[in-house]
Amino acid sequence: MNNTVLVTCGATVSFPRLVETVLDRSVTEKLKVLGYGRIVIQYGRGFSDTFLQLVEKHLGLFTEKKSCGIKVLDKIENLKVISVDGIEICGFEFSHDIEKLIANNIDLVISHAGTGSILDSLRVGKKLIVVVNDTLMDNHQQLIADKFEQQKLLWSVHANTEELLRALDRSENEELLKIDNTYNKQFEKLLYNVAID
């Protein structure tokens, strides 16, 4: 169980349903079965206390640790490192080094459907499950996620355990297409098509 999954909720709007869905015992058990021993959760500003409450609510009592052993994370102020039920969970509000974290330490990304977060993962070629926040005023996240999924660049789901469990199975059995991380016409066209649809 050496693999690491990153859950990113974005920096501006918290996404409690995404955090709760990932912390559901059926999801953490599935991640362990798939070889993930660490879950890193970027939960957004002002969510630290709620994060710890959600861990206890869904997974029970936990032990806090001082470090998670990932340099880019251990530098983060107020990093929460928890050991519970055979899995390590690292939680933090925000990092300017998220793309570096993804590139060097992450095997799978479960992200909100913000364009910046999607692009951070696609640039470095990581498997990506996108969770649409359907509580937002318009459906721009759904439109973005659907377009990228049509291009076979990610798997798109809503914040519920059944859909996430299916996407985790897909991440083990299907291959996504990769995009070149340098500037190119194909990527420019993809972004243009996502933006105008």
From Swiss-Prot:
Pfam families in alphabetical order: Glyco_tran_28_C
User: Single GO molecular-function term?
Assistant: N-acetylglucosaminyldiphosphodolichol N-acetylglucosaminyltransferase activity
Q: Where in the cell is it found?
A: Endoplasmic reticulum
**Which BP terms in the Gene Ontology apply to this protein?**
dolichol-linked oligosaccharide biosynthetic process
Record's keyword annotation contains Transferase: yes
Question: What Gene3D superfamilies does UniProt report for this protein, alphabetically?
Answer: Glycogen Phosphorylase B
Q: Which UniProt keywords apply?
A: Endoplasmic reticulum, Glycosyltransferase, Transferase
What's the top EC group for this one? transferase
Q: Which reaction does it catalyse?
A: an N-acetyl-alpha-D-glucosaminyl-diphospho-di-trans,poly-cis-dolichol + UDP-N-acetyl-alpha-D-glucosamine = an N,N'-diacetylchitobiosyl-diphospho-di-trans,poly-cis-dolichol + UDP + H(+)
Task: Give the EC number(s) under which this enzyme is classified.
Answer: 2.4.1.141
Q: List the InterPro entries hit by this protein, alphabetically.
A: Glyco_trans_28_C, UDP-GlcNAc_transferase
Cellular component, GO annotation: UDP-N-acetylglucosamine transferase complex
Q: Which PANTHER family match?
A: UDP-N-ACETYLGLUCOSAMINE TRANSFERASE SUBUNIT ALG13
Subunit record text? Heterodimer with ALG14 to form a functional enzyme.
- Family affiliation: Belongs to the glycosyltransferase 28 family.
Q: What does this protein do?
A: Involved in protein N-glycosylation. Essential for the second step of the dolichol-linked oligosaccharide pathway.
Q: What is this protein called?
A: UDP-N-acetylglucosamine transferase subunit ALG13
Which organism encodes this protein?
A: Kluyveromyces lactis (strain ATCC 8585 / CBS 2359 / DSM 70799 / NBRC 1267 / NRRL Y-1140 / WM37)
Top-level taxonomy: Eukaryota, Fungi, Dikarya, Ascomycota, Saccharomycotina
